[in-house]
């Protein structure tokens, strides 16, 4: 499924505000504002997605406990159509504006981007570092590939991509593609599809890791 280009849907510029305040000390999500924006674009011509997808925002600091990670996790919005996806994407700060160690996630349904969630515990991620000047393009391309189900033919028939994340780091940013079952990762060619979509990008430190292999899987940080 190819996702149509973004419509021109932006916040009222007279408001001088955004649904998300990306200051380092307080990242606030105005869910009501996003609700108003998405409702404005939904009509009988909306193009439904194959499944709903939920945007999440969080900030992960070294030494953070599982409970703290969970409490720092903020749901932004669940999108059901191409139009609602673009209305959210266009009206939250670009990843380049997020503070250090903040992350955006887009997860299938309303599953949370936590390793130990029942729906995620058997899965894992393809993880790679991205040059900062390429992060915006990579994140957008992966989002579109994900909601367009472009990884379906590159996963094992018993598996699927269930999310994608981008995390702001000091030198290079990190992107991750989540799948539902780590035991089928060797049968997948998700990385091959990413390289096809982004042939101009020089990814670094590319690898796959099951969630259960993280040292913090049972008691420390419950996410990347």
UniProtKB/Swiss-Prot annotation:
A cellular-component GO term for this protein: eukaryotic translation initiation factor 4F complex
GO terms for MF: RNA 7-methylguanosine cap binding; translation initiation factor activity
Pfam families, per the entry: IF4E
Region (Disordered): 1-23
Any GO BP annotation: translational initiation
InterPro entries (alphabetical): TIF_eIF4e-like (IPR023398), TIF_eIF_4E (IPR001040)
Residues noted as binding mRNA in the record, renumbered to the chain: 115-116, 169-174
Residue ranges, compositional bias (Polar residues): 9-23
Keywords on record: Initiation factor, Protein biosynthesis, RNA-binding, Translation regulation
Family named by the database record: Belongs to the eukaryotic initiation factor 4E family.
Function: Recognizes and binds the 7-methylguanosine-containing mRNA cap during an early step in the initiation of protein synthesis.
Subunit structure: eIF4F is a multi-subunit complex, the composition of which varies with external and internal environmental conditions. It is composed of at least eIF4A, eIF4E and eIF4G.
Protein name: Eukaryotic translation initiation factor 4E type 3
Annotated gene: eif4e3
């Amino acid at each position: 499924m190819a996702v149509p280009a973004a419509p021109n849907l932006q916040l009222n510029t007279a408001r001088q505000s955004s649904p998300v305040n990306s200051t380092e000390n307080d990242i606030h999500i105005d869910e009501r504002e996003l609700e108003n924006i998405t409702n404005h674009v939904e009509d009988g011509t909306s193009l439904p997605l194959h499944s709903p997808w939920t945007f999440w925002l969080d900030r992960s600091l070294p030494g953070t406990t599982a409970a703290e990670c969970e409490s720092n996790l903020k749901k932004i919005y669940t999108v059901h159509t191409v139009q609602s996806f673009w209305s959210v994407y266009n009206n939250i700060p670009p990843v380049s504006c997020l503070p250090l160690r903040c992350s955006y996630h887009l997860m299938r349904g309303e599953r949370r981007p936590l390793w130990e969630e029942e729906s995620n515990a058997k899965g894992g991620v393809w993880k790679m570092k991205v040059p900062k000047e390429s992060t915006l393009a990579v994140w957008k391309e992966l989002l579109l590939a994900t909601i367009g189900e472009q990884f379906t033919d590159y996963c094992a028939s018993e598996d699927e991509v269930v999310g994608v994340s981008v995390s702001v780091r000091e030198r290079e940013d990190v992107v991750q593609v989540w799948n539902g079952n780590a035991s089928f990762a060797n049968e997948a060619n998700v990385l091959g599809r990413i390289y096809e979509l982004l042939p101009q990008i020089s990814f670094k430190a590319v690898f796959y890791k099951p969630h259960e292999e993280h040292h913090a899987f049972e008691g420390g940080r419950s996410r990347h």
